[in-house]
């Protein structure tokens, strides 16, 4: 990390810790406010090919309690060993009053000389640090502007209106999958869930080595993992793709990122061994470190990244970028029965930044169990979803083949013509293709409905929810997509109400239910575009016409029933029909 980026990130982290501690809010309460970071770079008058940079970090609201400048310098300077610059804090003589622009007295300024390439790298590192903050503190906003020789660029970082998930460890995580993928290479024509679904592991106690134990802290240091696949596998096809990569995000107390922007940082050394905490062989995976992380991306940059390869080192068809990525969030926090002072939290962050690898190595067994359990559960759910999709595909083929056998075996040209017109198909082959597409689209929509979640939810550790989640998921899927044959399922449909014409009804797809006119079939299959009111009136009209047609043509009763079934296909599969 370049020295300017290091200074900015450390100062931001210090201010947020101070902000949180002075506010005195309960654990898990989100900070709400805005910080401004501005860099003004002009050609240096003293150093050739260099830019003289003035960096200002300010709050647009009064930071609780203000800052003690001497204390700030005393605590921040040891964290900036490579920064030979003068730090200045805005005068607090005027109290907490704000000027017309809304800038509060909390304003830190320092100056450095950088070359243009280093400054560009600094800006990218700062942006990624801000992105890592807002996926945990989504109510915080950051305004970041850079002016180089008069040319200004500005960007605002925030996630206040994005979907979040409240974890049981007090962390609120942004779960919109766009935050974690930049240019996805998977097939986006397949339906997918727009959110990740993290599984929280149980907290693992951490032991601080004796040589590093002089922290003065009374409490317990713990690591809590959260694992998720991105994008959600509920949207994948029935093919079980291998995990393509693993991204690890490191967070310290108060949900603030640990500074480890490159693989040479001491805090990430323990992760160079890809199998140190996770046994990839049990998933038939071979992971290698990915040292080529692109800073110029809009997604959140992980602290550690692995990519999947074949054991021979060659990428195979099954080990490609089309599989999901495994996201692994590691939250290191301090549990104490007494309030922890700001200086202690700041010191703990400094300790973790320098010695995280040693601390995790000291507690390898418990950390490994915690991480492995979270990954195992994600993997099991992934396999379960893929198998469910396979059952869906098999059921669709049975349904389509059953309907096609009736259509192609019919000797009534008017029956075949009406069926083709219902789906706007030119021939039976196109009818089968469109029918399968309708089945697939709407069942996929039904399947994804179960992975939707509220804007903010609570997630408890996997040991408490594993059995219940799996049970509920099996129950939901069984209700929507039973494994029995189409004929057996349709035999149950008369319970919802079907006309009694004094004869035994068709058993191929079951008895007819509420009907809608043939012309409405195409409109109805557009998922949820047709209102329930309109569908109800169409059903009543169709019911009367069906009775009249059957009375006029007794011999064609079976095929009349089939006409009604074909015209009603989309309503039968429409997600809103069963809700």
Curated annotation (Swiss-Prot):
The keyword Metal-binding does not apply. Residues 501-528 have a biased composition (Basic and acidic residues). Residues 480-554 are annotated as: Disordered. InterPro entries: TopoVIB-like. PANTHER family: TYPE 2 DNA TOPOISOMERASE 6 SUBUNIT B-LIKE (PTHR14652:SF2). Component of a topoisomerase 6 complex specifically required for meiotic recombination. Together with SPO11, mediates DNA cleavage that forms the double-strand breaks (DSB) that initiate meiotic recombination. The complex promotes relaxation of negative and positive supercoiled DNA and DNA decatenation through cleavage and ligation cycles. Despite a weak sequence similarity, retains most of the structural features of the ancestral archaeal Top6B subunit (AC O05207), including the transducer domain that interacts with the SPO11 subunit and the ATP-binding fold, also named GHKL fold. Belongs to the TOP6B-like family. Heterotetramer of SPO11 and 2 TOP6BL chains. Interacts with SPO11. This is Type 2 DNA topoisomerase 6 subunit B-like.
């Amino acid at each position: 990390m370049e020295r300017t980026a290091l200074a900015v990130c450390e100062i931001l982290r210090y201010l947020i810790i101070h902000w949180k501690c002075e506010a005195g809010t309960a654990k898990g309460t989100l900070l709400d406010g805005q910080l401004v970071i501005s860099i003004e770079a002009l050609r240096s008058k003293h150093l050739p090919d260099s830019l003289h940079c003035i960096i200002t970090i300010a709050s647009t609201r009064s930071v609780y309690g203000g800052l003690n400048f001497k204390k700030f310098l005393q605590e921040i300077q040891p964290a900036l060993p490579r920064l030979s610059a003068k730090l200045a804090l805005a005068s607090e003589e005027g109290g907490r009053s704000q000027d017309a622009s809304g800038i509060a007295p909390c304003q830190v300024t320092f100056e450095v000389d950088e070359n243009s390439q280093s400054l560009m790298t600094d800006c990218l590192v700062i942006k990624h640090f801000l992105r890592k903050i807002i996926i945990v503190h989504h109510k915080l906003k950051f305004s970041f502007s850079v002016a180089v020789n008069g040319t200004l660029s500005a960007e605002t970082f925030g996630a206040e209106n994005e979907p979040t998930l409240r974890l049981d460890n007090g962390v609120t995580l942004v779960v919109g999958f766009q935050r974690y993928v930049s240019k996805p290479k998977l097939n986006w024509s397949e339906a997918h869930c727009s959110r990740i679904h993290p599984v929280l592991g149980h907290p693992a106690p951490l032991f601080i080595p004796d040589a590093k134990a002089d922290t003065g802290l009374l409490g317990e240091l713990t690591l809590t993992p959260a694992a998720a696949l991105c994008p959600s596998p509920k949207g994948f096809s029935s093919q079980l793709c291998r995990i393509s990569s693993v991204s690890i995000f490191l967070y310290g107390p108060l949900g603030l990122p640990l500074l480890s922007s490159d693989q040479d940082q001491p805090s990430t050394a323990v992760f160079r061994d890809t199998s140190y905490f996770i046994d990839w062989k049990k998933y038939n995976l071979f992971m290698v470190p990915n040292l080529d992380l692109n800073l110029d991306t809009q997604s959140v940059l992980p602290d550690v990244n692995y990519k999947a390869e074949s054991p021979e080192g060659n990428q195979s068809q099954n080990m490609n970028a089309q599989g999901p990525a495994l996201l692994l969030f590691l939250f290191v926090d301090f549990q104490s029965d007494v309030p922890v002072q700001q200086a202690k939290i700041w010191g703990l962050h400094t300790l973790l930044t320098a010695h995280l690898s040693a601390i995790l190595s000291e507690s390898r067994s418990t950390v490994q169990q915690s991480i492995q359990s979270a990954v195992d559960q994600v993997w099991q759910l992934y396999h379960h979803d893929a198998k469910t999709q396979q059952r869906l595909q098999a059921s669709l083929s049975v349904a389509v083949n059953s309907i096609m056998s009736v259509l192609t075996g019919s000797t009534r040209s008017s029956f075949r013509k009406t069926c083709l017109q219902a789906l706007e198909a030119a021939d039976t082959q196109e009818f089968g293709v469109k029918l399968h597409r309708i089945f697939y689209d709407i069942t996929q929509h039904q399947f994804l409905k179960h992975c939707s979640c509220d804007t903010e939810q609570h997630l408890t550790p996997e040991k408490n929810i594993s059995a219940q989640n799996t049970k509920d998921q099996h129950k939901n899927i069984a209700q929507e997509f039973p494994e029995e044959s189409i004929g057996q399922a349709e035999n149950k449909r008369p319970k919802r109400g079907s006309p009694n014409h004094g004869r035994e009804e068709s058993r191929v797809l079951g008895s007819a239910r509420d009907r809608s006119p043939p012309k409405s079939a195409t409109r109805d299959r557009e998922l949820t575009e047709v209102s329930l009111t309109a569908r109800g009136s169409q059903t009543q009209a169709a019911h009367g016409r069906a009775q009249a047609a059957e009375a006029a043509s007794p011999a064609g009763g079976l095929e009349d029933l089939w006409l009604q079934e074909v015209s009603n296909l989309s309503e039968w599969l429409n997600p809103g029909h069963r809700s």
